[in-house]
Design a protein with these regions (language model features):
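Multi-pass membrane proteins that catalyze or facilitate reactions on polyprenyl-/lipid-phosphate substrates
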Residues: 1-202
Length: 202
């Protein structure tokens, strides 16, 4: 969203400008993917062991992340062209930024109120996260397809709403982002490669 705003004010239009923007997004997403992979390498290793039947907690976390990823994986390819056609403008992005700020403020206020009134519900761990909670977070992540809506904000708020504490909501959000950003970057490379290759070479 922020990059689209900059491109609008910089008067970057046309196929070449869009290709350069896609190329730049791939580069910065690669940095985010590497950073999250490094920070959460222990959790990633735990999930790998879990899928080999050697770590039940890692297996549970891995399956929950896959479940949370499914809504975006199912909807993203079908909505990609529509989003680029209708939502990559200043007004839609401004609306998303404003609405996202209000949603985040509401969620934080709600969490503080619940923690104050019901200390026992102060926050669950990832071991307590159910598959229904995971898919709920995944559906909230889909709102981040709207440019200007923060993916991490939507998924952290989703974690709040299913009862996770702040640290675990953020952890789940970043691990989900590792999968989602990797898939999104791969999808863009496949579908936009002919336009982006010259800009990536530069």
């Amino acid at each position: 969203g922020h990059l689209v705003i900059v491109s609008e004010f910089a008067d970057l239009e046309g196929k070449d400008a869009k290709a350069a923007l896609h190329a730049y997004l791939i580069v910065i997403q690669a940095g985010a993917i590497l950073a999250v992979g490094l920070i959460y390498r222990k959790e990633i290793w735990s999930m790998l062991l879990g899928f080999l039947g050697m770590d039940p907690r890692g297996k549970r976390l891995g399956f929950n992340l896959i479940i949370a990823f499914l809504p975006a994986a199912a909807m993203g390819p079908f909505l990609d062209d529509l989003i680029e056609s209708y939502l990559f403008g200043l007004l839609p992005i401004a609306a998303a930024l404003f609405t996202g700020a209000l949603f985040m403020h509401w969620a934080e206020s709600r969490k503080k109120r619940i923690e104050g009134e019901y200390p026992a519900k102060a926050g669950k761990s990832l071991d307590d996260l159910t598959w229904t909670g995971s898919i709920f977070i995944g559906f909230l992540q889909c709102f981040a397809m709207w440019p200007g809506t923060s993916r991490s904000m939507m998924t952290i708020v989703g974690g709040y709403l299913v009862g996770l504490d702040r640290a675990k909501a953020a952890e789940f959000s970043f691990l989900l982002g590792l999968i989602t950003l990797t898939a999104a970057a791969g999808y863009k490379c496949v579908t936009k490669w002919s336009l982006m290759s010259q800009h990536l070479a530069m």
